[in-house]
Amino acid sequence: MYYVNVILYLLEVLKPKIILGNLLSLYGGYGVAARGHIYSKLLFLDSLSLFLIVGSACVLNNVIDCDIDKIMLRTQCRLLVKYNKFCKLAILIAMFMLFLGLILCVKFINVVCFCLFLLGWLTYIFLYSFFLKKTSAISTIVGSISGSLPPIVGYCSVTNNFDFCSLNLLIMFALWQIPHSYAICILHFRDYKIANIPVFPVIYGFKITRYHIILHIILFFISVIVLTFINSINYKFLIISFFLCLTWLYYSLLELTIKNSKLWAKNIFRWSIIVIFLLNIIMLFGFV
């Protein structure tokens, strides 16, 4: 039982849900570029590099957030909060993972992906985690940029080129993350307020946040349509994505009448997961 608990604690520090979400996005971007030709070796190298680099960022984020994690109710039981003496070890493990991931990327994938991974890591750790998360409401927007790079890495691992399609993917995934993240902020509003973290709902309130969520869902909807035409993805993708985005938008508008903001945010969050999961699956297998 002791060893099971140790493994669970280690997995918690790596934030496996975030890694899995990033892997799925990488596969979506890969699928858009590969157009039905799945190269298993390249996909494996992409996945391994992402696991190491994103895992490294997640571990360091745990270290950086120790001071606020001990204040928020939902994070008080995290490993590095309870056992602060492991922080130095966590930093060493994170730096080793980063080094190994970047070496794999530059040696076996390409320099474009290496630069994208490094840019995402630096943005997430220094600009987002160290500075903006605790000082500014725009932290979510900056975090969305680093969070939207995995699908670009998947795309560029095939094309070895950052083009207009990869730029649209970047915009599309960044736009998706805003309503997704704002919904999380509403759901955990009390924790963020107690910890004095200036997330958008805390600074501007629920009403303005709701309108921003709706606006970003509409912009995301447009970016998905643009992707269909600039990359010539088949119309099966367009039809399915149209109904998915329309449903997400419908719930965001319908739920405006609900006075319970957390119930509204819960539905927005749930649909954000459904939409991005299914879109990535279609992007990966849409050409097969």
Curated annotation (Swiss-Prot):
GO terms for cellular component: plasma membrane. The keyword Lyase does not apply. It is a multi-pass membrane protein. One of its GO terms (biological process) is heme O biosynthetic process. Keywords: Cell membrane, Heme biosynthesis, Membrane, Transferase, Transmembrane, Transmembrane helix. InterPro entries: Protohaem_IX_farnesylTrfase, UbiA_prenyltransferase, UbiA_prenylTrfase_CS, UbiA_sf. The chain crosses the membrane at residues 6-26, 44-64, 89-109, 111-131, 138-158, 169-189, 213-233, 238-258, 268-288. It catalyses: heme b + (2E,6E)-farnesyl diphosphate + H2O = Fe(II)-heme o + diphosphate. It is an enzyme of class 2 (transferase). One of its GO terms (molecular function) is protoheme IX farnesyltransferase activity. It is found in: Cell membrane. The keyword Phosphoprotein does not apply. Pathway: Porphyrin-containing compound metabolism; heme O biosynthesis; heme O from protoheme: step 1/1. Its main location: membrane. Its EC number is 2.5.1.141. Carbon 2 of the heme B porphyrin ring is defined according to the Fischer nomenclature. Converts heme B (protoheme IX) to heme O by substitution of the vinyl group on carbon 2 of heme B porphyrin ring with a hydroxyethyl farnesyl side group. Belongs to the UbiA prenyltransferase family. Protoheme IX farnesyltransferase subfamily. This is Protoheme IX farnesyltransferase.
